[in-house]
Amino acid sequence: MKFFATTTKGLEDVLAAELIALGTRDVVPGNGGVNFSGTFKDGYKACLWLRTANRVLQPIASFPCPSEEALYEGVYALNWDELMTSQMTLAVGAKLRDSEITHSHYAALKTKDAIVDKIRDRTGQRPNVDAKDPDLQINMHLARNQCTISLDLAGTGLHKRGYRRDPTIAPLKETLAAGLVALTGWDQASPFVDPMCGSGSLPLEAAQLASNHAAGLLSPDFGFQRWPDFNAGLWKNLLEEAETTKRELPANLIFGSDRDKRSVDLARRNADSAGIGAKIRWSYNDFTKLEAPASQGTLICNPPYGERLGNEEELTAFYRKIGDTFKQNWKGWTAWVFTGNLALAKQVGLKASRRIVLYNGPIECRLLKYDLY
């Protein structure tokens, strides 16, 4: 059985390493995701454990699609009555590029029409559409007039960990945060500090990693749990295994701080919701006044970079303060800055030993490494 796990552009190799660690086969990174093979058990495990995957798709068909008629016929030809009942709800998402069909909303509607027509012709009843919470989420991908139809195992984005309460103005998506933590190479033994933690995505993802807490363990449910062939016994065993393999998170290992008290309070609530609130050290403090908790460790921050927060003049001065504070207060540490503004990054005034290209949504970003001696 073949699968495709999508991810943030730039995290493909990180996701591939996760899939290899899970024991899946034929792991091949691609553009924006990773192909892999396995059983339904592997698909379930992928939804439960993967930290950097946005979605886990199961391709069920691929066919030439030079026209809307070809799209309808290709989708209608599939055995949809074996994949869903007329009582189930569905939703279709479409992504298109370099094809004769150019409107994604129209393509999604055409795909939906073919599916419900096939179910009606086989059963006499049409299933309903539920765009917000469907029983079966279907992905239609059209590239260069070749259409691939996939089932979305989770049914929703895997960044929805189940612990987040009210998001702050510009939250860092959990899957991207997990990727940033992985890219730092943090050893999970020395201190991990985020001095601009916002609602806590980076410390929380670091804590889940260090405690071997499955990324999807708090998620209320996944789409595949509503499918006709769902194996409830297998899923129960996987959940029990995930619970028993969790580790105790050491105290004084992970630190989150922010100068905005509302953000820190929200981060605490998110951590409490995740069951690890007592183990993360939170503080309400300005970064320039924060003291290093040890002689060495990993610091990572996602300072505002002008797309949604702050203004250019204030941010220029702020980035200069970041560099000054690194030099004065964090000698012996490895520091990482994630930003979508390269001009601002230069204001740090330190030479980066590594630059990693990533995307935060449509924004091209850099993860910059600074070795502080």
Roles of regions detected by a PLM:
Residues 2-136, 153-155, 159, 166, ...:
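Accessory substrate-recognition/RNA-binding modules or partner subunits associated with SAM-dependent
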Residues 81-83, 289-296:
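Short amphipathic alpha-helix with an adjacent loop that forms part of the alpha/beta core around
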Residues 95, 143-183:
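Class I S-adenosyl-L-methionine
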Residues 139, 365-369:
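Conserved hydrophobic/aromatic beta-strand scaffold that supports enzyme active sites
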Residues 172-292, 308, 312-316:
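Conserved S-adenosyl-L-methionine
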Residues 296-302:
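Short SAM/SAH-binding signature in class I
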